Swiss-Prot record:
Chain segments carrying region Disordered: 896-969
SUPFAM superfamilies to which the protein is assigned, alphabetical: ARM repeat
Name of this protein: Importin-8
Domain Importin N-terminal: 22-102
Gene: ipo8
Source organism (scientific name): Danio rerio (Zebrafish)
Length: 1024
């Protein structure tokens, strides 16, 4: 392979004028043996221009990601798909670790992705040598090889981070080699605060973080001291930067936005990340699983106090206005939160708690300069930042809130102290408005514990009236927004004065409709919706204004693209379904325009937020459609708008649009629940085309819509053979293409629905096709009883459709592995699996099928062999049906939840300085604890499986109804008894064969079924 030719092609990809020709050259060359190793040689060569090396690294990364894993041809393909040749793989494996060590940072980033993919597919099977290779450089006295080898080791560790314990053996073996060296290396470097030293330390900590659950008590002590030292040591004021041509830099003069990225703060962040993770997951007695009980006790008593002492120092530094990076502060607060529940750590924390809450937590919860700057420069970005879940997760302010809430709930002195502190601020007319914002933020954060204590709950209405309502008209926009947020937080409060509630609703509505500041409008929208949800009278007050309110909500959504507001508008639509009727079409049109705008925006593909927002818009349209479903005139107008939205998604390539398929299929389902227009029948063909392009993953999402096509307008379905052909072809493709057993169950169910829906409607020509499709699937091995019984059920439905046709079909089906007709195999499988028919519909179908089987005029020979199983199987099915009918009578929907603003006290406080769960701690147990010997009563457990919740409550597929499930559908009790009586009168010998195996209990049960059938016949009532 000529390296110069590849170099020229790579150089061409950087030049827009040469890119197309260069890419064609590379695409014609990449399958040639030695191409990939040549790329790696180019990447590491310092004689090659840097941009070319970068381009080569990106190309190699893409090749490894796509073509490293062995791939077999898919069904129907003749040519084997391209894989990187094994000789080339060997060369890359041999040189990849060295390449990572030698290359600069931007190229390393591409190569580490390559290495992780290689390890994923080749370790340990094809590449056990990677461990020795990394260890060679890690043990080297040449410090220049340490960082690169640690990056390589990190890829190995990350591959195992989330694997089950039993799959981690190769990693455990490797870490026996690496852990001592990692500990030795970081200990050696701790006193060296230079950039490269701390960079290596940080990488060691990242590796350790991914291994935390594997560390035992023996080695933990050394690591705890290392972690404590890293957190405790000072960040150097001046550092020597090799990357900036040897210049000295002052850390304290770095821009504040850049300081968190300094390596010393990153190193502290990872040390704290480890400590917090250990405490939360493994070191907190009473909150750990059984295997960590001993370690949790050991951790709390041995390490927690020493670590917490260091963290108290970190918080004091922040309080004294010394710089602490946001993530370090956030992790510090998270660790302290965990310590609140334990007496040992609480006793150490308690003397400092008032200072922490008043002088550290409180300032974090106040409106800041950076908030004001962002609000003024970009209010929409301010909204996005305030509602971003990830930002919340890593925010010091959120961690401060969590610490405050936990302490207020768990330790009795915290809540009164904090409320008194906030009260003093609120009553002070000269208080800094930002401190007023902080006080309201604290009170809103503590709303839940405040509403649970009568002493505070009774004062909250007055507090809102005196301190919150006036600020809803403040000239400071951030105080108006905060006041709306407080009303949102206290929306469950039981108001004693109706005028106060009315005033709250009116003020919030005014801020929503009239305020000029978008962040205020967003908070007002959320507050109004929660008031309407929690206060019946608020719902009444807003009813006359619902049109301007909804229009304003749409305007805000259009302007801000804030996903939280799509949830608000959906809930308002459900609350005011009648009032929304007159504006439903306009709302849907507006939402469709917003959706189109989002999809066509330039930054759509780069912004995950826009995808989330677009999904929220589709969900809102779906809500309108659901609420308006039975209003025919409106639904017809909505259909055209919805079809435009559906078309917008389906016309684009599946890449980038697939995330919307579930939502647009839900829209199409909503448009077909009551009637199906010609336009919706045309959509079936479009969906079929989409399905053909690897959309098996979405078949289960298509299922409700396909069910509607079959059941809502069966006449139209049967009027044109292509409709039924399309649906059958989709089901057949799912059943023959390894789509997975869940989609296959759905495909079989749809075939059953078609058979039952079209019984007596002349689809005889379809029955052999349907039956052969499911039986062929059965012969290929089935893992789950659900798929097995579902395939059998299609054949049983065909038996119900036309017994003679079904038996004829079975006698004529031959599969390659067996020259015999499949009749005997099918009936034997059915007899063996009757106990796996669960739920009401499936058992009912099985009973009807067995009843028909008993009456067959021309009995297949296999029936003589299984005759003794037929009636006992039916009796077992009726036992299940009896339990289902009884449970449906007993388990009427209950009214859950207590009245809002409950008068009951709920005390979560821990007495005095005790632990939340006792000093020894209690392991978290599974929801059902074993009793006695594990092997005891095994037989009973097997029997009880037949009566588990799934068996009684039905199966998920039962939501796809058939004529059998209607109130006037076939009665299985009457059907079975009538069949057995006809057999008794027409063929006494066969009747004797059917009933003679029954024991006394079974005969009694049979008589009960006769009696119940008679009762149901005379009363016309089903169920018990």
């Amino acid at each position: 392979m000529d390296p110069n030719r590849i170099i020229q092609a790579l150089k061409g990809t950087i030049d827009p004028n040469l890119r197309l020709a260069a890419e064609n050259e590379l695409n014609q060359s990449y399958k040639i043996i030695n191409f990939a190793p040549t790329l790696l040689q180019i990447i590491v060569s310092e004689q090659v221009e840097f941009p070319v090396r970068q381009a080569a690294a990106i190309y190699l990364k893409n090749m490894v990601s796509q073509y490293w894993q062995d791939r077999e041809p898919t069904l129907g393909e003749v040519v084997f798909p391209f894989n990187i040749h094994e000789n080339d793989r060997g060369q890359i494996r041999e040189n990849m670790v060295e390449a990572i060590i030698r290359c600069p940072e931007s190229i390393r980033a591409q190569l580490t992705v390559c290495l992780r993919a290689i390890i994923k597919h080749d370790f340990p099977g094809r590449w056990t040598g990677v461990v020795d290779k990394i260890n060679l450089y890690l043990q080297s006295q040449n410090s220049g090889s340490w960082y690169g080898s640690l990056l390589a080791l990190y890829q190995l560790v990350k591959n195992y981070e989330f694997k089950k314990a039993e799959e981690r053996d190769p990693l455990l073996a490797a870490m026996q080699i690496f852990l001592p060296r990692l500990q030795q290396l970081i200990t050696q470097l701790l006193s060296d605060a230079t950039f490269i030293s701390v960079l290596i330390q940080k990488q060691i900590l990242k590796i350790f973080h991914a291994l935390v659950q594997l560390i035992n008590n023996t080695v933990m002590t050394h690591w705890m001291e290392i972690l404590r030292t890293v957190v405790d040591r000072d960040v150097p004021a001046i550092w020597f930067s090799e990357c900036l041509r040897g210049g000295f830099q002052e850390t304290l003069e770095a821009d504040e936005d850049d300081r968190p990225e300094l390596i010393w703060w990153k190193c502290k962040k990872w040390a704290l990340h480890i400590l917090t993770r250990i405490f939360e997951r493994y070191g907190s007695p009473g909150n750990v699983t059984k295997e960590y009980v001993e370690f949790a006790d050991f951790f709390l008593k041995t390490y927690a106090l020493g670590i917490q002492q260091v963290l108290l120092k970190v918080m004091e530094q922040h309080r004294q206005r010394q710089y602490v990076s946001p993530r370090v502060l956030q992790q510090t607060l998270s660790f302290m939160t965990q310590g609140v529940s334990h007496s040992l750590t609480w006793r150490q924390m308690k003397p400092h708690m008032q200072t922490i809450t008043h002088e550290l937590v409180f300032p974090l919860m106040c409106y800041k300069d950076e908030d004001e700057r962002l609000w003024q420069e970009d209010p929409y970005e301010y909204i996005r930042m305030k509602f971003n879940v990830y930002d919340d997760h890593v925010s010091p302010a959120t961690a401060a809130q969590t610490l405050l809430c936990t302490a207020a709930r768990k330790r009795k002195e915290v809540l009164p102290q904090m409320m008194e502190f906030c009260h003093q601020i609120l009553v002070d007319p000269s208080a800094d408005p930002r401190r007023t914002d902080g006080a309201l933020h604290v009170i809103g954060t503590l709303a839940q514990p405040l509403l649970k204590k009568r002493v505070y709950r009774d004062q909250m209405e007055l507090m809102l009236q005196n301190y919150v309502f006036p600020l809803l008209n403040s000239n400071l926009a951030y105080l108006r927004a905060r006041s709306c947020w407080v009303l949102h937080s206290f929306s469950p409060l039981k108001f004693h004065n109706e005028l106060v509630l009315r005033n709250a609703v009116e003020l919030v509505k005014h801020n929503l409709v009239e305020d000029k500041e978008m962040p205020v409008k967003v908070e007002a929208a959320i507050a109004l919706q929660t008031l309407v949800r929690n206060q019946e009278q608020a719902k009444v007050y807003i009813r006359p204004f619902i049109r301007p309110v909804m229009q304003e909500l749409l305007h805000i959504i259009k302007e801000t693209e804030n996903d939280d507001l799509t949830g608000v508008i959906q809930k308002m639509i459900c609350e005011y379904s009648e009032e929304v009727t007159v504006i439903a079409v306009d709302m849907t049109q507006n939402l469709a325009e917003i959706f189109s705008k989002i999809l066509q925006s330039e930054e759509y593909e780069e912004s995950e937020d826009k995808t989330v927002m677009a999904l929220g818009i589709l969900s809102t349209i779906d809500t309108i459609l659901t609420v308006m479903g039975d209003r025919k005139e409106i639904s017809q107008q909505l259909e055209g708008i919805c079809l435009q939205v559906i078309g917008l998604v389906l016309q684009k390539p599946i890449i980038g649009m697939a995330e919307f398929y579930e939502e647009i299929l839900s829209l199409a389902f909503g448009l077909t629940c009551y009637c199906i227009s010609p336009q919706m029948w045309q959509l079936l063909g479009v969906l079929y085309d989409v399905f053909q392009h690897d959309c098996f993953d979405y078949f289960t999402d298509m299922m409700p819509l396909l069910h509607n096509y079959v059941t809502v307008d069966t006449n139209m379905l049967l009027s044109d053979p292509k409709y039924l052909e399309v649906i059958y072809t989709m089901c057949k493709k799912v059943l023959t293409s390894d789509a997975g057993e869940d989609p296959e169950c759905h495909a079989a169910k749809l075939l059953e629905v078609i058979i039952l829906q079209c019984r007596g409607r002349g689809i005889d020509q379809c029955i052999p096709l349907f039956v052969e499709a499911v039986l062929e699937r059965l012969t290929r091995g089935v893992k789950s009883s659900e798929l097995r019984t579902m395939c059998l059920q299609v054949v049983i439905a065909a038996l119900y459709y036309n017994p003679t046709l079904l038996i004829h079909t079975l006698e004529n089906i031959r599969f390659p592995h067996s020259p015999e007709p499949i009749t005997a195999q099918f009936i034997n499988q059915w007899m063996n699996d009757t106990e796996f028919f669960l739920g009401l519909h499936d058992r009912k179908m099985c009973v009807i099928g067995l009843s028909i089987l008993m009456e067959l005029p021309s009995r297949p020979a296999v029936l003589e062999e299984v005759v003794g199983q037929i009636v006992p199987s039916v009796l077992l099915l009726f036992l299940g049906l009896k339990h289902i009918y009884a449970s449906r009578v007993l388990n009427k929907p209950e009214q859950f939840g207590r009245a809002q603003g409950s008068e009951e006290e709920e005390n979560e406080e821990i007495p005095s300085d005790e632990d939340e769960v006792g000093e020894k701690g209690v392991a978290l147990q599974p929801s059902v604890a074993p009793t006695g010997n594990d092997n005891e009563d095994d037989d009973d457990e097997d029997d009880d499986e037949y009566w588990d919740d799934e068996g009684l409550e039905g199966t998920p597929l039962e939501e796809y109804s058939t004529p059998l499930d209607c109130d006037n559908g076939e009665d299985e009790y009457q059907f079975f008894t009538a069949s057995l009586l006809r057999v008794q009168s027409s063929d006494a010998g066969w009747y004797q064969s059917l009933t003679s195996p029954l024991n006394e209990d079974q005969r009694k049960q049979l008589q009960e079924i006769y009696n119940l059938a008679q009762q149901r016949r005379s009363t016309g009532v089903k169920g018990l």
